[in-house]
């Protein structure tokens, strides 16, 4: 999209896919399980819902090879669409499984009460945890986590612990998305417009998020359907889809923007999750030099090409991108797709202290199929 004037871009906007903060406030964007745990770079649920409605019917199968926090999977289930989501991140898959699973809420409340009543405990040995938490906060978290192995809902308790761990870090309130260094004394808080102090305990976060988790799971129960959801913890460049799919709805990582494993480092350290950050595509740590962009294009093209054999005859892929480097024409070609249509949406709100606006494209891809009668080379 480089070289386009802003006036030209505004003229192409699909207003059904573009919302202002007034049209779509945060509490609406983060309905039910979508706010089960903060996730930087989350797919807007209403965008996923609109793309699913436009391209798929109830009973069909959608695939998200970059499933992230599970937005496509949750929205697909609510529409009666079967969903398969893949992600290389252990934390992402944990969060997705909790969002889409059916829960015994009575048993969950019991297990949460037990975990909240557990005494503070010694945390796992970790220099990172010791650096980012006050000792009492870390012992609160470790005490709660000590109840996870005996729970009937261990993964749900793990998500509650992770969410509390995010809030209890020695980080400024206005800088929870990507804090760079621990805050060890009073600071001017841009979020609360006053002087704040570092967090010393985690128990109040655990209580608050335990209650909120049960409420959000119950809210999703009111709209969920019987449609199957499968979460695959794997590199989407290497998996074989087990069945035909009727479409893709996905938002791939943008190059050089977010380190998804590092974003949730607290969960990996506290819960002992397997860190596979070396397999991330477009990680911020890799930068945006030519070599990094080439590797990114290779990875996205391999992922889309891997899914192509499973496409049904009318299947399309809706791929949401901020393609300011004009990478996706070549990615689509190399993956064996043509771009049938481009929709443009205006994004004018961002989380935390980040401000500004930008444009995203929704690329509608179709597999390039051999023409009938064409001779093999």
Annotate each PLM feature:
Residues 322-333, 337-377:
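Class I S-adenosyl-L-methionine
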Residues 90-153, 273-286:
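Conserved phosphoryl-transfer catalytic core
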Residues 1-58:
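S-adenosyl-L-methionine
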Residues 141-250, 255-258:
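SAM-dependent nucleic-acid methyltransferase catalytic core
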Residues 253-299:
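Mobile active-site "lid"/loop adjacent to the S-adenosyl-L-methionine
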Residues 297-313, 332:
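A short glycine-rich, Lys/Arg-flanked "PGG" loop and its adjoining helix->strand segment in the class I
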Residues 48, 60-79, 83-90, 96, ...:
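Conserved proline-anchored active-site loop of SAM-dependent methyltransferases
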Residues 61, 314-318:
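Short glycine-centered segments of the SAM/dcSAM-binding site in methyltransferase folds
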């Amino acid at each position: 999209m480089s070289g386009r004037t802003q006036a030209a871009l505004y003229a192409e906007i699909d207003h059904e896919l573009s919302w202002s903060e007034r049209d779509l406030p945060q509490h609406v964007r983060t309905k039910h399980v979508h706010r089960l745990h903060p996730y930087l770079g989350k797919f807007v649920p209403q965008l996923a819902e609109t793309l699913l409605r436009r391209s798929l019917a109830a009973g069909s199968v959608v695939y998200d090879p970059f499933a992230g926090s599970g937005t496509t999977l949750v929205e697909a289930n609510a529409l009666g669409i079967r969903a398969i989501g893949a992600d290389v991140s252990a934390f992402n898959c944990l969060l997705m499984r909790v969002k889409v699973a059916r829960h015994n809420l009575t048993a969950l409340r019991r297990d949460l009460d037990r975990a909240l009543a557990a005494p503070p405990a010694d945390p796992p040995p970790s220099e990172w945890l010791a650096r980012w938490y006050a000792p009492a906060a870390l012992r609160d978290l470790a005490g709660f986590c000590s109840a996870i192995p005996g729970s009937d809902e261990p993964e749900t308790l793990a998500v509650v612990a992770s969410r509390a761990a995010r809030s209890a870090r020695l980080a400024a309130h206005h800088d929870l998305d990507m804090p760079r260094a621990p805050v060890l004394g009073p600071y001017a808080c841009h979020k609360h417009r006053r002087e704040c102090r570092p967090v010393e305990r985690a128990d109040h976060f655990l209580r608050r998020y335990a209650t909120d988790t049960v409420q959000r799971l119950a809210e999703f129960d009111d709209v969920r359907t019987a449609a199957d959801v499968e979460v695959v913890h794997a590199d989407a460049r290497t998996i074989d889809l087990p069945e035909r799919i009727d479409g893709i709805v996905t938002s791939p990582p943008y190059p050089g923007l977010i380190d998804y494993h590092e974003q949730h480092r607290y969960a990996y350290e506290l819960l002992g999750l397997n860190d596979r950050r070396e397999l991330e595509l477009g990680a911020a740590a890799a930068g945006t030099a030519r070599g990094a962009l080439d590797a990114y294009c290779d990875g996205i093209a391999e992922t889309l090409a891997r899914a192509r054999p499973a496409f049904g005859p009318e299947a399309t892929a809706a791929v949401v991108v901020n393609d300011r480097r004009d990478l996706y024409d070549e990615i689509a070609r190399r993956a064996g797709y043509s771009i049938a249509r481009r929709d443009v949406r205006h994004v004018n709100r961002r989380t935390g202290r980040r401000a500004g606006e930008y444009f995203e494209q929704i690329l509608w891809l179709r597999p390039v199929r051999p023409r009938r009668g064409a001779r093999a080379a």
